[in-house]
């Protein structure tokens, strides 16, 4: 036994009666990208939005709206920021593919399988150059998504991490190479993800505003077709070339009009309006995990107040007037089931005019859970001011903001320059504070182990060494007793042991599928334990 292991063993023995632990998950293979404070921030817009590539952005920047360009302001403070441009009404999948192509400066590949399933072209527009240099080789990216930009960036990260076996197989069958987006192994290319007013779990706006939604979808499709074949496309681009909505120079004007306006975009079931429903959002969430190396932040808004008579939620005086009808309907829509069986309770009434406040906290799966890959709670509330070290692999739910949906990006006539810029200065500070944490070693996350506690230095040293973790993302339970199973798990971690091929023990109280079974098997095989009975 080395001197180092002897030292750690003595620490374990000292803590035997005072600590508890959980098994640390194994790290996944990754095409590692270095991460540093040189990593830029890329903003991803929501439904009907635009980025710096759109002509309209010079006149009315999406990020900043009537308060002026937010990215220019943040750049003046020394931050490197960009605003991506993806399809305003495209699905989360298509937008994720477009985001990848924009970050790499390539042609959009929507995937052979996805394109066939939704009956549209596999390839889309070409981005002439990367949004910034060095992504994936020298720098990672920090993503900030507003509204539907949340689902876009979360699905993007999932594909970057785990890829799509279906798309790889479909590309091979077609005799083509898959997009690198679908091969996965690139989670370290994303350092953090911040979502503002993002309907992680869908929005009841769609369910409660049927007439408004019918008008919105029909108008959007008509505008997309008209803009797509005229010079207005340079000002505002719906980017629906994959559906045949584009101007063909080899056609007459009449031929183009007939071809484009005969298409039925909504019938492809590959659009933002569908993905924003509660049922579809939960379906998307079921395929997305929380990555242990990525930092997550989420901001929800509420610009409604409770009616003292009905108890429902109505728009506040500070909400943009155009949001009033939708917000009012959302504020009284509850005690109902979606077509997929999700129950909308009273907590879904407060909203920002477009998104339910509760839906913007953190993403849940269809079973209602939000868990890390090792089964722990995947979110925690943060008060916005406590001096803590943010940890990766955990959603930090920030304090609810008194913003309507558009005030989060500057507002329309009701925006506040001071409030908007203060919000994003805080977001930048939180993002870049995570690099300070990384540079000074593994941050100690346990709020129930004060530095003044006698066991603090021992627990911290074992935590830094990867021998122990906590009973949750932020708790260690230092007064809890240690079980025999937990102790041999610590010993195996200390020894760096391979516990995968040890024969099973005869102990009836060690089920084969138990998390601790491999560690007990290892301990018995090496003569460390003998059992409390035969």
Question: Where are the regions a protein language model picked out?
Answer:
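Sec-dependent signal peptide cleavage junction
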Residues: 21-31
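Bacterial N-terminal signal peptides that target proteins for export
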Residues: 2-12
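Helical cap/lid subdomain of alpha/beta-hydrolase-fold lipid enzymes
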Residues: 158, 163-440
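Extracellular/surface recognition and adhesion modules
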Residues: 17, 459-462, 523
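Feature responds to low-complexity, polar/acidic, surface-exposed segments characteristic
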Residues: 26-28, 440-456, 469-488, 492-517, ...
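N-terminal non-catalytic accessory region
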Residues: 29-217, 384, 389-440
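Hydrophobic core
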Residues: 13-17, 21
